[in-house]
């Protein structure tokens, strides 16, 4: 019998000093984010992309604790977590950290929908409640339109109506036993907002052969900036109110440099090494406004990341999930991610990126984000959303 995993993002996480658990989470997330970004970009050639690898971790953590045998071991390897006890501790610490975030609007929520007449395994129910903060609700999947409507309404409520129609009624039927849903919502204001009156249409070079006019925000800002030769790019980090959240933008030096940058970002340590070069300075930023929504088939993406048994009947072995002797597996996994960046700040399921050009007539550099770029939304150094902008 089948299980559906649905994930949607607008996200974040917060932490003070880094503990051992937070270090484990950061390293796990860095590795997972690099792999997932590479796969999602591959599936969306030449398109704007936003994703939240971070929001995939909690449901995979839950499914790891619900599984046994090789399927269990495969999930822990993918999460870069050594055992069940560390998995529980890491995600419990994560939930505490999220609740402590200040200065931005942040919400993380989890819910498990179970087929009418079935119950969660007692131990799994306790872990889902105490570690992941998951709500549980029974629904009649045979009434697929009503069931999808209930799930989608909950999703809309958790994401300020930004993520709609996550679950297709056609994906639900009498064989559906459970739907796992995870949501992360982030809305933050720039610490130093852009003035709307300064926004104007400016050139954006989609490619060497295509230039368009896009609304571009302009402002003199205190940022962290670096030239990053190993990425052949410039990097800027801009803070949100509260100083826990920030947006990193990586702008290739070449108009057609985004593909080469994507290849370099397959290394999960590439970004952290580049960030070591950042220093505080003042710049005049030219940043295009943008809004992106991406729907990702996580079943395909995760399978390409060597998470295969979870989706294979007879091999998933989700024996600790429900009080049933049926053989369960994940039939579908979906993520919808959204981000909007404007003069006020960001509302997200993603992040943004930008580039730099030196100026000779002023004492501080100008940063012209006028070609395809990579972006990342972080909280206390943990990537929550990332993506690329090809055409704002």
Swiss-Prot record:
Keywords: Glycoprotein, Protease inhibitor, Secreted, Serine protease inhibitor, Signal. Belongs to the serpin family. Its main location: secreted. Residues 1-16 form the signal peptide. It comes from Manduca sexta. This is Alaserpin. Inhibits elastase. GO terms for molecular function: serine-type endopeptidase inhibitor activity. Disulfide bonds: none annotated. PANTHER family: GH10112P-RELATED, SERINE PROTEASE INHIBITOR, SERPIN.
């Amino acid at each position: 019998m089948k299980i559906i995993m649905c994930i949607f993002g607008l996200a974040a996480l917060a932490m003070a000093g880094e503990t051992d658990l937070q270090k484990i989470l950061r390293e796990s997330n860095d590795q997972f984010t690099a792999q997932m970004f590479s796969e999602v970009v591959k599936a969306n050639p030449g398109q704007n992309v936003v994703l939240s690898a971070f929001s995939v971790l909690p449901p995979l953590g839950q499914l790891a604790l619900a599984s046994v045998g090789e399927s269990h071991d495969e999930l822990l390897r993918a999460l870069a977590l050594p055992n069940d006890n560390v998995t529980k501790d890491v995600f419990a610490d994560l939930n505490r950290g999220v609740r402590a975030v200040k200065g931005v609007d942040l919400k993380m929520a989890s819910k498990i929908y179970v087929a009418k007449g079935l119950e969660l395994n007692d131990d799994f129910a306790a872990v889902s409640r105490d570690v992941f903060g998951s709500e549980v609700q029974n629904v009649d999947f045979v009434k697929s339109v009503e069931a999808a409507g209930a799930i989608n309404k909950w999703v809309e409520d958790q994401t300020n109506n930004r993520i709609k129609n996550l679950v297709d009624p056609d994906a639900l039927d009498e064989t559906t036993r459970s739907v796992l849903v995870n949501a992360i919502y982030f809305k933050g204001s720039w610490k130093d907002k852009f003035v709307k009156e300064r926004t104007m249409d400016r050139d954006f070079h989609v490619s060497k052969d295509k230039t368009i006019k896009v609304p571009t925000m302009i402002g003199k800002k205190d940022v962290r900036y670096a030239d990053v030769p190993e990425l052949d790019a410039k990097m800027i980090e801009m803070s949100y109110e509260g100083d826990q959240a920030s947006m990193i933008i990586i702008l290739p030096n070449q108009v057609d440099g985004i593909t080469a940058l994507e290849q370099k970002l397959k290394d999960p340590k590439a970004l952290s090494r580049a960030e070591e070069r950042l220093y505080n300075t003042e710049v005049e930023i030219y940043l295009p406004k943008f809004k992106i929504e991406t729907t990702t088939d996580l079943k395909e993406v995760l399978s390409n990341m060597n998470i295969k048994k979870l989706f294979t009947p007879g091999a998933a072995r989700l024996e600790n999930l429900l009080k049933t002797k049926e053989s369960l597996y994940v039939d579908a996994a979906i993520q919808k991610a959204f981000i909007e960046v404007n003069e006020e700040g960001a509302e997200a399921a993603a992040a943004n990126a930008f580039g730099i050009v030196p100026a000779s007539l002023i004492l501080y550099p100008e940063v012209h984000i006028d070609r395809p770029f990579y972006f990342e939304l972080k909280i206390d150094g943990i990537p929550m959303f990332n993506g690329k902008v090809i055409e704002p």
